[in-house]
Amino acid sequence: MRKVAIYGKGGIGKSTTTQNTVAGLAEAGKKVMVVGCDPKADSTRLLLGGLQQKTVLDTLREEGEEVELEDIIKEGYKGSRCTESGGPEPGVGCAGRGIITSVNLLEQLGAYDDEWNLDYVFYDVLGDVVCGGFAMPIRDGKAEEIYIVCSGEMMAMYAANNICKGILKYADAGGVRLGGLICNSRKVDNEREMIEELARRIGTQMIHFVPRDNFVQRAEINRKTVIDYDPTHPQADEYRALARKIDENKMFVIPKPLEIDELESLLIEFGIAN
């Protein structure tokens, strides 16, 4: 079973990218579990046809210790298994701690057991690696390969670089490696070339360039992934390509994060800062 975590700055499209990629893998016959590690609990909605499923933490709060696996995992598109860790009530407690509680419970209840024949587990993780709880999939070896969703915007690249620092910190202890950058295009000038160069300097690859297409939002409004909503649309092929590249990926590295002045010089070089 391959253990994958998707990171990236808030609002970059991690949950959308994760679910569309998982749809591509599921369509190709892979057994995938998605663990949403975001208090917004929107990491599985499109795979479940719009169902806002009850989170692990909400279930624990209501049921106490009497939680069964079927209470917290729902079956989604083409047999994908979906769960949301959820978070504390706003303004109370630590969301990172909630992820740790949720993943531990999933392990205790046998969500990762051989009987499920899982090929992949995907962790869709909130924002930047800023607190230990959100770094947990990296830190405790829950995830072995990381993909960072970014774009040619400065803050997205800055966040990607920060996440690389987190991977570097835990690479020896947890055995985690960077699998590549996924460029979720924002139609910035020279975006593809810039992210390819950023990847090269960090020591990784841009595994796929996902072009911007409003059809993604149209599918979302209809509560589906692109592949589910219209399998013949060109954007569906983009996500299939990304799924295939992740499935075939052999490049796993310990990244070399850039200093801030190196990052800024990259932005200047490609004209974004002019």
Curated annotation (Swiss-Prot):
Keyword Iron (UniProt): yes
Function: The key enzymatic reactions in nitrogen fixation are catalyzed by the nitrogenase complex, which has 2 components: the iron protein and the molybdenum-iron protein.
The protein's Enzyme Commission number: 1.18.6.1
Binding site for [4Fe-4S] cluster: 94, 131
Binding-site residues, ATP: 8-15
Catalysis: reaction(s): N2 + 8 reduced [2Fe-2S]-[ferredoxin] + 16 ATP + 16 H2O = H2 + 8 oxidized [2Fe-2S]-[ferredoxin] + 2 NH4(+) + 16 ADP + 16 phosphate + 6 H(+)
GO biological process assignments: nitrogen fixation
Family: Belongs to the NifH/BchL/ChlL family.
Keywords: 4Fe-4S, ADP-ribosylation, ATP-binding, Iron, Iron-sulfur, Metal-binding, Nitrogen fixation, Nucleotide-binding, Oxidoreductase
Cofactor binding mode and count: Binds 1 [4Fe-4S] cluster per dimer.
Protein name: Nitrogenase iron protein
